[in-house]
Amino acid sequence: MEQDELRDQLVDPKSPINIESLLDTITALVNDCKIPVLMRMKSVDNFISRYERVVESLAALRMKAADFRQLKVIGRGAFGEVHLVRHTRTNTVYAMKMLNKDDMIKRADSAFFWEERDIMAHANSEWIVRLQYAFQDPRHLYMVMEYMPGGDLVNLMTSYEVSEKWTRFYTAEIVEALAALHSMGYIHRDVKPDNMLISISGHIKLADFGTCVKMNANGVVRCSTAVGTPDYISPEVLRNQGQDAEFGKEVDWWSVGVFIYEMLVGETPFYAEALVSTYTNIMNHKTSLKFPDEPLISTQAKDIIKKFLSAAPDRLGRNSVDDIRNHKFFVNDEWTFATLREASPPVIPSLKSDDDTTHFEEIETRDRDNAGDFQLPKTFNGNQLPFIGFTYSNEYSPVKNLLKGHGAGSKQNGIEQHKPQTVVEQPLTNGHASGVPEEKYEAVKMELDSKNREFELLKDSIARNEIRAKMIENEKNSLSTKISDLERELKDNKDKLRHGADSDAKVNELAVELRMSKEYNSEMESELSKFRDKCEQLKEDLRKKSGELAQEKNETQRVFQQKKDADEAFAEIKRDYELLQTRENEKSVQLKKALDERKENGAYQQSVAKATDAEWERKMQFYEKQLEHANDERKREEQKRTAAEFDQSRVARKLAGIEANYELLQNDYKSMKEARKDLERDLQDVITEKRRLEIRVEQLMDSRNTDERVLSLCQDELVESQEEAKYKEDGLRGKIDGFKHELENEKMKTQTLEENLLVADKERGMLKMEVQELMQRHKWEITNKDQTLKHLETQLDEIKQQSKIESSEQESNDKQTIADLRKKLDLEKAHKKAVINKLEEEMAKRQPLKKGEKGVTKSALIKKEREIMALEQERDTMSKRIAALFYENDKQAEHFNIAIQDMQTTQDALRDELKECKEELANRNVNTRYEDKRSLDSREGIPSSLSNQHIQMEGWLSLRDNTKKSRKPKWTNCFVALNEYSFTIYVDEKAVSVILLIEAGAMAHVRHVTAADLRNVDDSQLPKIFHIMYDDASCNSSRHASNSDLSMIESFREESWKRHDFQELSYHIRTFCDVCNKKLSDIIRPTPAFECKNCHFKTHKDHVAQGSLPMCRYNTGLSRELVLMAPQTDNCNKWVSQLRRFIESSRSAAVSVSRVSSRRHAPGSSNSSTIYQ
């Protein structure tokens, strides 16, 4: 009973003492103890000496990275990479995740890989990615998973415009995947489209379980860190950051709500460029969740999003997943949750091969860094111990082999059957004792081993051939189906094109080609049947030979056992015989001595000697009988030995027969391979022929559709076309005359209307070309319609005559025709439905984009259509108003001339005044009174510090576009100029069209950005980007501060924060403190830090407690932000330096500027910044 329990634990993959774990244990101990310091101890040195070669042998026999050929890198994370690999033995493609052990040990939650391994290995669900193998070496962990060639849902959203129908389908599948994960007792915590992979069939599976955590008996988890992607993280997780709190599986359902919103709208609902702003929106989700006008979202979709993105106690799915399944959003006529797996997915990925990676982003391949190996420790540290038991195999595992061996035999012989069944290993060790030459037995052993290996290879080859035969059969079935479809279409084409001689010829050719294809297909079927028969015959021969080989093995074992027993018995008899001879010699000597003593002692001794002699004679007789019996036994054993040698020779003869049969099997296998190659070539020819026939049928269908359209439309449009063409011609002539008159009048207009007139001229040219095209098209249509009308009249006469003849026959064929038409109608409906589904996919599919170019969304297309309609209306309105504009232009020209003269006069006066001011500035006495110290520039509202420092810089920068949220930012090139008066952004270097002007004194802050400020930006771009904050008095001047405080730390007063609105964050990307310039970030254990939600000021938590902070530069309600990128890092540093000088100079003159401004301008008459639309 205890042995059975122990055996069950050894073969149970979930047991901590299974065979794989024990092998990991001995390997880890040897690797951890093999250091010079420990090997000085004799016990450790003996342990290493005993097991070092054993571990090396285990490493060679167990699964390793060398068993897979790496094809491409398809994913990269902070702790490892995901490679596309191919198994060298089975030629199967997998995705292999490789993790660095050193990074795993340094990480705080280093046990995360156990959850990922256990979920994928033991999850019996079709919605979760399956683990095939897990193994390790001294440096890395490897997880080999099934390959999902369709990529992730992020790739699908960038390639297609996702509709609500598609969103419903994919949401239902992710609900089923999460339900399966929750039933195992785990919470995912990082549900997002990046972790939803598309299989070869188009269905999705959940992946990336590194963030999963096990729930307790109450279905909750206690955690103090915020884990997950910022855009998808739930508010209760953010609220309890840094505090030990409980939450359940409802955090995953929040992420599902964000996922639905992103699928429908194209962006996440709470997205913001700065991480702290994203967290603020999530915490204020009740007010920040808004739905755009475009695209249109149904009421059911909005309802399920709101229920998912609600407070944790009220969130949909908190009580049961059935509440989600019963929501009205999932009601449809195509599938239910019970039939979801069998339903047809919206998109099935198109693949060129089994290792196609077109649905994955291109990732640069990096060389492996050997610097991350474990450093040689000074004492035992057990680096390999945390990974004991990680190894797992779904197929090639000793556990599987033990289970198979145990199932084949009885419990008593189970241990013997579990041993490797190589050819008679133990009897061969006794070659000399049995009298058989050892060299002969070694040769026989090697022969049988080689035959075993060849036998296994032959079995594998036959299995692969069977798979290939099934593939050929499936291809044959698909060809048969397509040929039958072509026959149906050919029949329809014959019925519809029977009146045309050319069509009949084409149909006849197609029929001949189809008949030849069918004949060829039948030949292929006969070849395939012969191929199957050969495979079955070879399999039967293999079964027979394997049975004979097993019998021969048993017979050989029996013979060698008999030899061993005979040798042992012969040796024992020989020892007994020698012992008896020794005793007989001793007795003879004693007898001789006794006779001598009897002669010497007299009569008394003679009587005693007689009795002794009689006793010795009896003993001698007894020993002689035993000796004769031993001789008989020795003869019998020699006979047995002779029989055993005869049996051995018989086994050798049978082995020779097996070798001959094996050569025959090899020849059959070679012929079978050649036949398979011939079949593959024939199959390729059939596929080529099928494609040619499909092209032919498509051409015939196109010509048939064209004829049908002409016949159906000509009769209706023939009468109307002439009148419509005449009416359009008269109207277009009138328009041409009108545009000619307008063109003559436009030449007399002033310079201010030249741009509008140029647009009108272009429109006139376009309309003229359209008129000409319309005239030519209508003339051609009239000619074509006339010819068609004559042809139709001729056909009509022929049809009338023919109809009289066929009227009698038509009545009898009506019923049959109606039945045929109904069948055709059903077929056409099915065909149309398939075409509609395909068209939906093609219409949703986006065009391939160039690098850096954004796709056109449905909302953008709708906006473009509206803009086109608005432009058309504007064109009509403009044509109506142009006459009035011409009349008003003369009056306006006079006013413009007068205004220009006034402006020139004013400009000359200002120039003179500026010249006088500069002269007066040069003659100023520095030691005069304070009022006289002010420069003329200051009196004019320009800070003297700015004018004296000669701040001037210009160049090209890239302005970040914040109009639309997206995963990849969009940058717009612009020309920027900085002088002592303002900071101006122009459209181009001509400096005519102004985008933004920031005057002196309005600039509040400038700084370099970090990775925490801008997400989705390449690391190479970060040193080139800087952030500007400025005041805009034209905006709303409300100054109420934000009430949301995500950190929930109320012990700090607002006065000590210096108007900052802080959020507690943990930085895992490179970030520095703005107070002490020390690092805030760490990949493993980041230090506690704060970031201001307004000015993005970053600092250590200790600085906030000490109160050593500068004042927040953000003016609530008035401040605006800009993000600019320079071409080079040095250029960015120069811009930041000049802008800081600009800000410092404007602040030093703020008092004087405010006084001058109060004298020269009325309150509210000027703005600090002006934005030009």
Curated annotation (Swiss-Prot):
Residues 950-1144 form the PH domain. It holds the Pfam family Pkinase. The keyword DNA-binding does not apply. Keywords: ATP-binding, Coiled coil, Cytoplasm, Cytoskeleton, Developmental protein, Differentiation, Kinase, Magnesium, Metal-binding, Nucleotide-binding, Oogenesis, Phosphoprotein, Serine/threonine-protein kinase, Transferase, Zinc, Zinc-finger. The lineage of its organism: Eukaryota, Metazoa, Ecdysozoa, Nematoda, Chromadorea. GO terms for molecular function: ATP binding; protein serine kinase activity; protein serine/threonine kinase activity; Rho-dependent protein serine/threonine kinase activity; small GTPase binding; zinc ion binding. The active site is at 190 (proton acceptor). This is Rho-associated protein kinase let-502.
